Amino acid sequence: MPAVAANPCCVPAVYHRRQPERTLLYRVVQAHLATWLALHDDGQGGQTPVLTEREFRRYLECGILAHGFARARCPDCGHDFIVAYSCKGRGICPSCTTRRMVETAAHLTDHVFPRLPVRQWVLSLPKRLRYHLDDAELQNAVLHSLLRSIEGGLRQSLPETGGATHIGAVVFIHRFGGLLNAHLHFHVAMIDGVFRGEDAEPLQFQEVCLTPEQMAALQRTIRQRIVRLFVRRGILDKDEGQSMIDCEHDGGFSLNASVRIEANDRQGRERLLRYCARPAFAQERLRQLDPERLVYESKKPGPGGQVSVLLTPHQLLDRLAALIPPPRRHRHRYYGVLAPNSPHRSAVTALAAAESTKEEAKAETEDPPEIGRAHV
């Protein structure tokens, strides 16, 4: 007679294969990929990049048992089951990109960000400048200008007490908009304050909340520095740069810092990091009207107030191919005290690990310990 579970309320989880071949995206890619690749081969040497074709073909093999699987055994009940291999793609596969989003957010929450307030900064550039950000060197220069400006704005809002100041941030580079359109912009998850102290000293964290006036001044500073950077690179001439700086409506620059997560809101911090690490394509937003018409919807209005876009299968593949990230480029980067080469990284991130361990042992309803504003 089979053994009865000691706790009848505990129902064992049953593994179910996700069956990607039943999804709309899989059927569209499977039916139209060969034709789409043939149309992109113009017979004069022009063809789809190898990386793009490889991403699509690996997606068609992801989760399919015929392309390989591993056998697993449940240690509790002894039941055997098989798990299909995944493609581990970075741009197309909804399953792999979503899993990477969840793992990234969990890692940053549990092992990187200490229990301190976090603010999200989102920077978007005008279209005429945005298209030049495919240059990795220029992209890095824009990021450094943004972070130096924010650090300077935070430092100016503090009383002068001497000593060096440091920020801590993780930058996510998004190359997409809500309607699968190309839109390169930056999401910065930054500890909302500065750390004071020299390299050989323990750090003291000081929380900073900028006023609306200080935020507006910071936005003007960021716009000026980035425009001058483009002028120095020869992308804009001096007159064009000055006109963008003097524009009354921010000249197409957008800086949003309205989202702030409190220090003791661990779930909110993880939700924010999931949002920052989200993939370009959301499978649940794709609908099919007929075999030749697809609709992709956005949660927020896109360019011109659009909330959806009508696409043919080949147009969908065009948009997905354009959003595949370049190889050997990081999707997120660490800055300040969270940077790999920072002498303070181990001390700051140790707080995240300590808080993660404490939360496993205690209920989240308890008051958090006051470690964020003491010496790190």
Predicted feature residues:
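Beta->alpha loop/short-helix hinge microenvironment recognizer with preference
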Residues: 1-373
